[in-house]
Amino acid sequence: MNLTELKNTPVSELITLGESMGLENLARMRKQDIIFAILKQHAKSGEDIFGDGVLEILQDGFGFLRSADSSYLAGPDDIYVSPSQIRRFNLRTGDTISGKIRPPKEGERYFALLKVNEVNYDKPENARNKILFENLTPLHANSRLRMERGNGSTEDLTARVLDLASPIGRGQRGLIVAPPKAGKTMLLQNIAQSIAYNHPDCVLMVLLIDERPEEVTEMQRLVKGEVVASTFDEPASRHVQVAEMVIEKAKRLVEHKKDVIILLDSITRLARAYNTVVPASGKVLTGGVDANALHRPKRFFGAARNVEEGGSLTIIATALIDTGSKMDEVIYEEFKGTGNMELHLSRKIAEKRVFPAIDYNRSGTRKEELLTTQEELQKMWILRKIIHPMGEIDAMEFLINKLAMTKTNDDFFEMMKRS
């Protein structure tokens, strides 16, 4: 029996299962307590129980396996991992572990891990000789992540404009600069769907910090990947803990040569949370930002890299501007030069209800010649020369109308060549 499978089972089915095992009064209990009771009963009959989760090591040396369903929040059904197991398998925070567990004994509160079967979806022996993330060699992104799906839908238009304006590669550190109500969340959903469709081999994680609960639900239903969220009614310390868990998990997977993509909405809110949590240093920048507060969100964003030894970590984050808050401007200014791809959304275009509201002339990718063929690059540059003299709204309307006539960007370039 598997703890994770039970967590995904509806309560009504759990109650039926519990009653068939001879348990009583289940209808009045919380879901976690029902799972607890079922597993205890199951273990009494001498059968094995299995569980998995992402390890968080606490200051005392022991750790717990947290579940992604509860966005890595501490809960009663976490699995205890002893310090000896952590030392033996050289485990670190963020390792995804699955194995055999046992129910709590008298006086204990948590399930405990008995035997480690897998570390990061790999045998435990293989995890011992991996290179630490900090020692891997970072390179420029050189393998393209295509967004275009080629189905001719209106959603695909956004992906195609993105491919033309600022191509994305594996290991990109991208910043989507957006004023409020310019369609940044829709753009992220679009990117997530394109990645799931075109690149199923990549591990996709969507991290929503300080977002509205209904947007979290919408994202979970639309995206085929792991959606981890901390909504705006949660304290800043919770935002920070969730972000740290996600980035640590991503680093551990990159050490195992996986391609990981994190979509973060938004880095501004994350930086605000760090600003609240960090102890006051006494030096305060403009807008009330503590001088030490931006070090950790920069470390988060700076983790994105293409790795020479294999694997990559791509982070595409949104940054808010024009919110009327001086702090947001300062945070954006700090992050401005750090990314190697920038996509600017425009309030003016969005107000005219032209989507995607991308400011084509200001968007772009550094070293885009590594991601595209020489021929494609020439065509993209010619397109920029045509679009540059137009105003931002006219440019976007012109591009969308022309793209709508064709199904793929290759067809669009052919049409451009003929005309």
UniProtKB/Swiss-Prot annotation:
Binding site for ATP: G169, R170, G171, Q172, R173, G174, K181, A182, G183, K184, T185, M186, R212
EC top class named in words: hydrolase
Example of a GO cellular component annotation carried by this entry: cytosol
Stretches the record annotates as RNA-binding 2: 284-288
One MF term in the entry's GO annotations: RNA binding
Single GO BP term: DNA-templated transcription termination
Region spans: RNA-binding 1: 61-66, 78-80, 108-110
Residues at the site labelled RNA-binding 2: K326
Family as reported in the entry's similarity comment: Belongs to the Rho family.
NCBIfam families: PRK09376.1 (NF006886), rho (TIGR00767)
This protein's name: Transcription termination factor Rho
Pfam families linked: ATP-synt_ab (PF00006), Rho_N (PF07498), Rho_RNA_bind (PF07497)
Every Rho RNA-BD domain range: 48-123
EC number, UniProt record: 3.6.4.-
Annotated gene: rho
Organism the protein comes from: Salmonella typhimurium (strain LT2 / SGSC1412 / ATCC 700720)
Keywords tagged on the record: ATP-binding, Helicase, Hydrolase, Nucleotide-binding, RNA-binding, Transcription, Transcription regulation, Transcription termination
SUPFAM superfamilies for the chain: Nucleic acid-binding proteins, P-loop containing nucleoside triphosphate hydrolases, Rho N-terminal domain-like
PANTHER family linked to this entry: TRANSCRIPTION TERMINATION FACTOR RHO (PTHR46425:SF1)
PROSITE patterns associated with the record: RHO_RNA_BD (PS51856)
Reported function: Facilitates transcription termination by a mechanism that involves Rho binding to the nascent RNA, activation of Rho's RNA-dependent ATPase activity, and release of the mRNA from the DNA template.
